[in-house]
Amino acid sequence: MEVKQEVLRPVSNFKPSIWGDQFLVYDEKEEDATVAQLIECLKEEVRKEIMVALDDRNKHANLLKLVSDIQRLGISYCFKQEIEQALGHIYDVYGDEWEGGSLSIWFRLLRQQGFFVSCDIFKKYKNNDGTFKDSLTRNVEGMLELYEAAYLRVRGEVILDDALAFTKGQLEKITKDPLQWNCNLSLSKHIKEALERPIWKRLPRLEVVRYIPFYEQQDSHNESLLRLAKLEFNRLQSLHKRELSQLSKWWKDFEPTKNLHYVRDRLVELYFWVLGVYFEPQYSRSRIFLTKVIKIATVLDDTYDNYGVYDELEIFTDAIDRWSITCIDALPDYMKFIYKILLDTYGEMEEIMASEGKAYQVYYAKEALKELSRNYMIEAKWTNEGYEPTLKEHETVSFITAGYQMLTPSSFVGMGETVTEEPFKWALTFPPLIKSASVVSRIMDDIIGHKEEGKRKHVVSTVECYMKEHDVTEEYVYDLFKERVEDAWKDMNLELLTCENIPLALKMRTINLARVIESIYKYDDNLKNVGAEIQDNIKSCFIISMSI
């Protein structure tokens, strides 16, 4: 009788989901017609305010402040055309020679919108000897605005590098002794949060949670705008909870604790990740698909990394590459289960998009997933052979396995009429924008996770590769890699401003993916270890409503 040899698997023990079935059931309530009518009335009020200010140069500074508040309150999707018109008009009228109020708000808003305005305008903040003027130091809010604007810098913009270093130092002093600077507690807290994470690196939905209470405390706040922001937050929260319930049922039906016991059970955290990519109501269909995609990618990652043995992984990679149900019989039982989920999920979305004549969108999403799986396989081969790649070899592969080359085109699927085939083709070439976001993802992940991964059989990280090649300390690599992350942000900013053949709405998906990493991997791996910060963020987005 043949003795069946036991397969030794490199399993990691992940903690179960802390949420249980909390989001499984959503008690949907019919929207109050009176509230819906009020929202429309408030929108009209704000719309009129924007358009009135547009034609009066004396109101242009206030117009920019209004646009900034609309964006930070999370309701810019309500005024997309008006904001585009307003910022386009400001650029047409002033070019690089802004004459109104805050230079920093003007600069930040126009660069965010894709206008490559010059940073030379900030020279007026400097003395002849290159130091910053005392008048700036005395203006706390002005320093904060300049600090935020400086994060829109590209490589070579020395004045913005200087401005960031200067304002950061000054703002840190203020937070240590706010009373000395006549800084109230609300503004001091606002500054601390900015130093922790600037606007440009924040997840837009979390900025809403943070900014609404601050805005409400300002004497100059616009009551209609505030009320609209709160009502829209709650309305959107209901939509998000409904989506999360739908996704929770989808995942629970697979009985993951039984059939995928080795996989991180992090559906809620992954939906939060996708909410960072787009939270707006018009992207509901895309959000649901992308959450399924990132969940599948997590299953693949854990299979290649933590459970599958080499021979199985070779067959599995070939099956994904061929993408045919005829491949399923060659797979081990647990892989058959995964493969069926994979084919069914993409097939379902392909049918939906085919009904709109856009099945090609899912084709490109599939091609991106195939590329991800091929590179997972290369890492598995290195681990199996005990091979230590050079840093260059490593990054050729690990920038792909960071996942953003796959997630970017996948995030475009179902976004609407403005998405043509060209952006999908562009995304699959691994262009500079997506590569830079992948640098942020890979490096921040490796800095946080390389020590834990080093405790088991695992491909070496970029941190170890660099240490070995250059014979330097771990701390040296950390500092160097953090500079690389900042340079990657500068490169993303440049692409946002110069990659003109891709719509801004699509480029922002990649920017938002990088923002997610800044939120989830800054201090810990919040997918493996669901810490207090991400728990609080999830509660803020899905459980705690705004009081009206």
Swiss-Prot record:
Cofactor(s) for this UniProt protein: Mg(2+)
The keyword Metal-binding belongs to this UniProt entry's keyword annotation: yes
Main localization (coarse): cytoplasm
Subcellular location field: Cytoplasm
GO terms of biological process kind: diterpenoid biosynthetic process; terpene biosynthetic process
Residues the entry annotates as binding Mg(2+) 1: 301, 305
Annotated (2E,6E)-farnesyl diphosphate binding sites: 264, 301, 305, 442, 445
Reaction catalysis annotation: (2E,6E)-farnesyl diphosphate = germacrene D + diphosphate; (2E,6E)-farnesyl diphosphate = (-)-(E)-beta-caryophyllene + diphosphate; (2E,6E)-farnesyl diphosphate = beta-copaene + diphosphate
Protein name in the entry: Sesquiterpene synthase TPS1
Taxonomic lineage of the native organism: Eukaryota, Viridiplantae, Streptophyta, Embryophyta, Tracheophyta
